[in-house]
């Protein structure tokens, strides 16, 4: 039984989407509601991560200084050096402690991501691998039914079921042999029967040969004919029920990519990518990641990171619904970072901040050409 991302998607994410769609029939609002619910549920974990990052950003200079002193002091005694370093980590905290909340969040966030990349928001792909043998070897082929892993498909609003692609005679064919790829539920109900029960749903499967185009022929109904020996891969796609539905300024929740092959620009997707980059930059500023400590190279890296990360969506496009989720999630995290950055620091951390501020003021008061120690008075 699957208790991973698929379990979370089917038993947590999709029921939430179905509930909100039943209240307000808008898949766009359902995405917004689902994103906010998951983000609020993960708030304590992400808050712990943000607090730890804020703390480590403050204590890191002092911690590094102490570590360097220990390495120099006990360079001839590795055991004592290790012991003292562990004491420093106990005093200031382990820098890796903030990774645990992130690791705990990852399965939930990946399940949310996977949910928005599947039905009903996007087309679901099935990969059928075939082996074609010469016709004289047909006696060696043992018929054995072939089925792809089942995937969740929305047949109608609020109604979804597991659907698999099958080849009753198996995926090993002889040249000249004909067969048909069929979709059906786990209970064996044919996909056309499901569609007949919901005539309002226009879900016409599509077929594409991704490997071995010269070895096989396939029509719109999934009928195939083996032409030449070799390996073949056919990709079947069941369209997403809500893929062509819009929300606010978004034309289609399932649209993938900011630019079509005919060079048509989709400004709704471009706008979300730009806004995501801006929110990422603001989040970096609030979390202090843009404080490079006077290192110009690191400062440059921090500034261009949001540009690079956002620009990736132009080359590795995602469905508009997934982009909307990422924008909402990032804005939520930015607001959370802002709120937590206004929290009072623990007393011991506040003392470190005050000490650092005093040192900074003292360094500013000392001019570069002045000696750090007072000059001895000369007697004439």
Swiss-Prot record:
Its main location: membrane. InterPro entries: YidC/ALB3/OXA1/COX18, YidC/Oxa/ALB_C, YidC_ALB_C. It is a multi-pass membrane protein. Residues 361-380 are annotated as: Disordered. It is found in: Cell inner membrane. One of its GO terms (biological process) is protein insertion into membrane. GO terms for molecular function: membrane insertase activity. One of its GO terms (cellular component) is plasma membrane. Required for the insertion and/or proper folding and/or complex formation of integral membrane proteins into the membrane. Involved in integration of membrane proteins that insert both dependently and independently of the Sec translocase complex, as well as at least some lipoproteins. Aids folding of multispanning membrane proteins. Interacts with the Sec translocase complex via SecD. Specifically interacts with transmembrane segments of nascent integral membrane proteins during membrane integration. Belongs to the OXA1/ALB3/YidC family. Type 1 subfamily. This is Membrane protein insertase YidC. It comes from Nostoc sp. (strain PCC 7120 / SAG 25.82 / UTEX 2576).
């Amino acid at each position: 039984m699957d208790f991973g991302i698929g379990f979370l998607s089917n038993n947590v994410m999709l029921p939430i989407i179905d509930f909100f769609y039943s209240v307000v029939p808008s898949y766009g609002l359902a995405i917004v509601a689902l994103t906010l619910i998951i983000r609020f549920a993960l708030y304590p974990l992400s808050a712990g991560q943000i607090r730890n990052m804020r703390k480590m950003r403050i204590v890191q200079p002092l911690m590094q200084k102490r570590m360097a002193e220990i390495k120099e002091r006990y360079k001839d005694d590795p055991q004592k050096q290790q012991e003292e370093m562990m004491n420093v980590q106990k005093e200031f905290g382990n820098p890796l402690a903030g990774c645990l909340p992130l690791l705990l969040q990852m399965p939930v966030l990946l399940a949310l991501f996977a949910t928005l990349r599947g039905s009903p928001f996007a087309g679901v792909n099935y990969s059928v691998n075939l082996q074609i043998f010469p016709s004289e070897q047909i006696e060696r082929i043992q018929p054995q039914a072939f089925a792809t892993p089942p995937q969740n498909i929305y047949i109608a609003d609020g109604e979804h079921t597991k659907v698999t692609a099958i080849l009753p005679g198996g995926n090993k064919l002889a040249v000249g042999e004909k067969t048909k790829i069929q979709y059906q539920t786990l209970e064996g109900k044919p996909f056309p029967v499901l569609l007949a029960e919901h005539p309002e749903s226009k879900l016409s499967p599509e077929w594409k040969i991704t490997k071995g185009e010269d070895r096989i022929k396939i029509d719109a109904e999934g009928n195939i004919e083996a032409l030449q020996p070799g390996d073949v891969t056919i990709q079947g796609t069941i369209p997403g029920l809500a893929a062509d539905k819009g929300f606010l300024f978004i034309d289609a929740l399932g649209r993938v990519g900011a630019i079509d092959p005919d060079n048509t620009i989709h400004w709704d997707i471009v706008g979300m990518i730009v806004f995501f980059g801006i929110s990422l930059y603001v989040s970096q500023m609030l979390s202090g990641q843009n404080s490079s400590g006077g290192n110009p190279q690191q400062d440059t890296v921090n500034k261009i990171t949001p540009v690079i990360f956002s620009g990736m969506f132009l080359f590795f496009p995602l469905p508009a619904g997934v982009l909307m989720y990422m924008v909402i999630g990032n804005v939520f995290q930015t607001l959370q970072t802002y709120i937590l950055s206004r929290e009072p620091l623990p007393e011991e951390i506040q003392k470190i901040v005050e000490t650092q501020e005093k040192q900074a003021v003292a360094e500013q008061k000392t001019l570069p050409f002045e000696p750090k120690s007072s000059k001895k008075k000369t007697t004439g």
